[in-house]
């Protein structure tokens, strides 16, 4: 048989000697052989878990090798020789001393472990030895706190195997385990693999701590480099595990202060804390703490009993993969009003089951509008949270309303990934997730909620004087959760809501997927089914969705100048900008809208420097002052107020309320280049010929008929006073009723002819009026008798008013005496041979059946 590897058993000998010390009061005083004793040692070591299976297998190979190769006698002779020479006893003592480096059992120092005997002295002696302390199977009762000095290791035979508890006689005020220098602290403490039973039952079912951190199961003060692994804390009068600063009383020194002697570099893992008096695991005024893979559940009392509480002044704390169940708060990050809040806290993976408020972040005393703003409540980041069936069936905190998440008074809270699920919708009827009480700069992303069909709001940013603000909500999926999916209260100025998908077909009386009181949230990507309204903003319903953006907006633009928070640049290049409120540039290059309510579109190298100004489809143009428009023009400038430049080049428009057009110059705007103008008083000016676009060539005016009836086209008319009738033989002809007048005067198209006061010659009476702030113009003076409420019809719409062609080529009715080249006279309004005008053309010969023909006559 090949010789096994023996070097791996070098330390085994030391462990054997410890067992010899326990089993053999003196060497070889038992009847068993040496090999039997060695195998007994292996059996014992295997029972207490000191050897792994592969080590035992190797030892069996050693035994087989010794026996099969006939070395048994040699080994016995050698050991007996050592004993006779006194070497064996020395070896035993030496190995025992070395073995103690691996730990000493409290039973070695007299601990009984029957749950009745006071074992405190055994614990104190074992700890005082300076060696690692081992707690074997048993229930070890103590009559006072177990105090832990620096550089202490205490391990047990495992949770629920090794149990430490208080005797019933211990009064209120002691913690079961506490570091011995709780004023200024200890260091290098390692605790693992046992149960702490606070035996709170000795005080009755409603027992609570006597004050400060007293009466906790494990209390660590002002210490550093502390490892707490696989500890179960049950029946705590106060906290299961309490990490705090120096002193038994918590310090209340005011917000913005730092308590002296913090605990730091604390590592808590794989612990369990049921039947709490207050919190399962709590931290206070300490830093650099990790808590992982812990389970805190089922508190005894109905106060603010939290699974894990990161409390007053704690900072730089990391929680990972923990569980809470049936507590008031699953994880509470908080502070009282006169201390700093916990800050810079990371929660990465937590499952809250049946807690009232799965995640509760708050700084008490800083919630109302009149409270001082928190100086310290900042920085909480959460990833991959779960909330299962939040409820308050037990009536915690006077029946406080359940929440999945509540954020109050904290600045800088980020939640990335939160799954909330309930099969009991009636347990949460208000708001599931709330951002409230002056919380600011909160980001909620990756939220999935299912089953909260009776909740008024799935997510609610509460408004009013103490509401939240500066909140980003994105990537939200709601499955029958919330009559309102995302609701935003009043007075909240900075909210962004994006990518919300909701199904509400299982909700009684759903309202809207997104509902906001104010009109200025940013909203995009909202969709769903089962809700009557997709978005409701400031009371206005949008049933097909809505996209709202606040702040400077730039889209499809390669580069830009400054953009105002209420401006935009779209589809533009070459440093276009919108530098004023309510300004914009669209599809343009190198253009800047510099004034409020100004727009540049489809243009290049243009500038608006006045409000209410617009430039469209133009090049190298500028507007100043107020209300000007330039369209399809180049190298032009509109100043003054309410002026328009159309289809022009090199035009400078000034004054007020004018429409201008023209062309000229070499790119420098000038009024001399104006070719057409129309003023606010209706004055039209043209620099060149005004022509008609048809062949009509007479000039006409409106005249009222004597009998108030219309006179048919082509009849010659004469005056009777200021009115007209058909001209008779020998009467002076003033013209003919015309349908071909190129110019027509006197229609009074838009207003009653007496609307404005006139002088004795019929001219308008003017007065100076301030038409815009600081802008004065002469305007016709209103007639006091004018009533604008009366309906008005222009003369062209009234039958008594007829257009009379006075001058030009006019079509008239003729009899059979009229000849081309001769003049005419009138007979019952029909032209007959005479000496007025000249007949140019007979266009329709006379027909006796009709009683007239038609001729074109030139009248002067």
Curated annotation (Swiss-Prot):
It comes from the Viruses. It is found in: Virion. SUPFAM superfamilies: Pectin lyase-like. This is Pre-neck appendage protein. The record marks 697-698 as: Cleavage. Structural component of the 12 appendages that hang from the lower collar. Adhesion protein that binds to the host cell surface during virus attachment and mediates teichoic acids degradation. GO terms for biological process: adhesion receptor-mediated virion attachment to host cell; symbiont entry into host cell via disruption of host cell envelope. The N-terminus has three domains that function to attach the appendages to the phage, digest the cell wall teichoic acids, and bind irreversibly to the host. The C-terminus is an autochaperone that aids trimerization. ATP binds at residues 752-801. Autocleaved to produce the 74 kDa gp12* assembly attached to the phage particles. Autocleavage of the C-terminus is a posttrimerization event that is followed by an ATP-dependent release. Its cofactor is Mg(2+). Its main location: virion. Keywords: ATP-binding, Degradation of host cell envelope components during virus entry, Host-virus interaction, Late protein, Magnesium, Metal-binding, Nucleotide-binding, Repeat, Viral attachment to host adhesion receptor, Viral attachment to host cell, Viral tail fiber protein, Viral tail protein, Virion, Virus entry into host cell. Mg(2+) binds at residues 309, 311. Pfam families: Pect-lyase_RHGA_epim, Peptidase_G2. The gene is 12. GO terms for cellular component: virus tail, fiber. The keyword Kinase does not apply. Binds 1 zinc ion per subunit. SMART domains: PbH1. The active site is at residue 701.
